[in-house]
Amino acid sequence: MLILQAGGTITTRDAAGRLIPALSPRTGEAGQASASALRFYTEFADPSKEDYTWNRARAEAMKAFASGDLALYIGYASEQPLLSRMNPNLNYAIASVPQIRNAARTINGGRAYAFATPRTTKNPVGAVTVAYLLSTAESSQALAQALGIPSARRDILNQPVTGYDELFNKQAIIARAWLDPDPKKTESIFQAMIENTTSGTLLLTEAITRADQEMGQILGL
């Protein structure tokens, strides 16, 4: 999300329509979104910085927040029920995600899932029909209510709601995302990029370049 707020992205499409990594600027491109975001993020793990608040000895963020040892946790709306189960007595409030000062536009991060029909499916018409029915306004609203998450449809998000659902819906409207080729592998890539930076194993720009190259390998480039 920090990279998106800084004006960058993680993957994009080239002139031929292929999905390619975009962590590192290509030849002739300007922009330091990835570097700015990674620098900001990793400074919290740098003992020489005033913002130093994290090290490997600390618990995972959600667990620390649920136990009352962390004052601020940035997560997804879908995590609210889990937090309540982890600590039913936790007293907390939910607010919109912080933004970069003087940013041109407000950006939030979100996870979006889509239906896809394999080319080898034996019943393509049936598969497309099911996908269509599940994406209707009625189905989308029912799924959102059942799962406790915002709908992916703007017409549903614009309907009047109460409580935190109003905040969640507003945040969903400004949410931005990127095409993730393999969530588990990309999570490992980002973790390695962060650890390579905080440990001093690689320079910040080198860590980004390596992550960009590893992302390219996932995409078969």
Question: Residues of each region from the PLM?
Answer:
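Short amphipathic alpha-helical coupling segments at ligand-binding clamshell hinges
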Residues: A33-F40, K122-L134, A142-L143, L203, ...
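Ligand-binding "clamshell"
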Residues: Q5-G8, L83-N102
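Long, aromatic- and glycine/proline-rich binding clefts that accommodate carbohydrate-like moieties
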Residues: P88, A95, L143-N196, L221
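Glycine-centered hinge/linker elements that transmit conformational signals in sensory
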Residues: D14-W54
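Paired acidic/hydrophobic, glycine-rich loop segments that form the ligand-binding mouth/hinge
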Residues: A71-Y76, A93
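Short helix-initiation/N-cap motifs at beta->coil->alpha
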Residues: D51-A66
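Extracytoplasmic/periplasmic solute-binding protein
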Residues: M1-P25, L70
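A bilobed periplasmic-binding-protein/Venus flytrap-type ligand-binding module shared by bacterial periplasmic
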Residues: G110-K122
